[in-house]
């Protein structure tokens, strides 16, 4: 029973770590006042956008497509 509880705790910790790792690769790309979001990018995609002169900011996946986010985009345009 004790081993089962420990195994379940480890699985929960791993699940949280995977979610956080996935969220790191969501980012917002801005160029000449136009911003859009990328969530399914590859790891090196952030570097490629930066090299091209884009303003790249990491955004946690939970904040995507909320009303507040849309209002911020309207202010920038």
Swiss-Prot record:
GO cellular component annotations of the record:
extracellular region
Expression tissues: Hemocytes.
Instruction: Write the signal peptide boundaries.
Output: 1-23
**UniProtKB keywords:** Amidation, Antibiotic, Antimicrobial, Cleavage on pair of basic residues, Disulfide bond, Secreted, Signal
Compartment(s) where it occurs, according to its Swiss-Prot or TrEMBL record: Secreted
Arginine amide-modified residues are where?
Answer: 40
| Positions annotated as propeptide | 41-77
Q: Which cysteines are joined by disulfide bonds?
A: 26-39, 30-35
In the UniProt record, does the keyword Signal occur? yes
One GO-annotated biological process of the protein: defense response to bacterium
Asked if the Swiss-Prot or TrEMBL record annotates the protein with the keyword Ligase, the reply is no
What function does the entry list?
Answer: Significantly inhibits the growth of Gram-negative and Gram-positive bacteria.
Q: Tell me its family.
A: Belongs to the tachyplesin/polyphemusin family.
Q: What is this protein called?
A: Tachyplesin-1
Q: Which organism is it from?
A: Tachypleus tridentatus (Japanese horseshoe crab)
């Amino acid at each position: 029973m004790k081993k089962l509880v420990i195994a379940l705790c480890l699985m929960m910790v791993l699940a949280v770590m995977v979610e956080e790792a996935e969220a790191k690769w969501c980012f917002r790309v801005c160029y000449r006042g136009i911003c859009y979001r990328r969530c399914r990018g590859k790891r090196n995609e952030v570097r490629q956008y930066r090299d091209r002169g884009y303003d790249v900011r990491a955004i946690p996946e939970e904040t995507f497509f909320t009303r507040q986010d849309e209002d911020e985009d309207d202010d920038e345009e």
